[in-house]
Amino acid sequence: NVQSPGHPPTPELLRINPFGKIPVLKHGSFVLYETAAICRYIDDNFPGPLLRPVHAEKAALMNQWISVAMTRLDPDIIRNFVIPMFFADDVKRRDPEFTTRMNEMTDRIRHDLSVLDAAYADGWVCGDRFTIPDMMIMPMIHYLNAMPGGPEMLVSAPNVADAFRRFKARTSAAQTDPLLPEKL
């Protein structure tokens, strides 16, 4: 049971995250919330290639893109576009105010994608290897791509679209692919 917009968090969610938000990681008896913390924990505790660069400049870029993902991309893509689009019924989607707001967000997301596209020119956001910010950004791209107008936005960001294709082909991504309801 997770929270949905317009509804209070469930008691179950509040027991594991007092802020009532997802994601939450449960690993044995250990519970951790907040995406960046979860990603770092996964990197530190599970086998596989490191997801954090060791070189100081690359590590700083990683931290920059983690911040961008949390403070710009998540609000723009998820909070102000995907969630409203997902929960809007046909009547709401035809409402002029809603349409205006979604058009404004589309413009903002197109700008975000143009910035991301330049960053993804070398393959991944921090260069030629998959890192923690990619773990945070690509699921947002997944949800954007599932929304009306999302695939069209990605056309103007070919490097992001290519990274998204490669991300979806990763075993870890395929095993955790979120199912979207047929509503869309």
Which ranges hold each PLM region?
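Charged phosphate-binding loop/patch that engages nucleotide di/tri-phosphates or the phosphate backbone
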Residues: 176
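GST-like fold's C-terminal all-alpha helical module
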Residues: 71-168
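GST-like domain detector, emphasizing the conserved glutathione-binding G-site
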Residues: 1-100
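Residue-level signal for nonpolar/aromatic packing positions in well-ordered secondary structure
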Residues: 25, 38, 62, 116, ...
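Residue-level recognition of oxygen-bearing side chains
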Residues: 37, 159, 172
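Residues at helix-coil transition
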Residues: 43-47, 121, 169
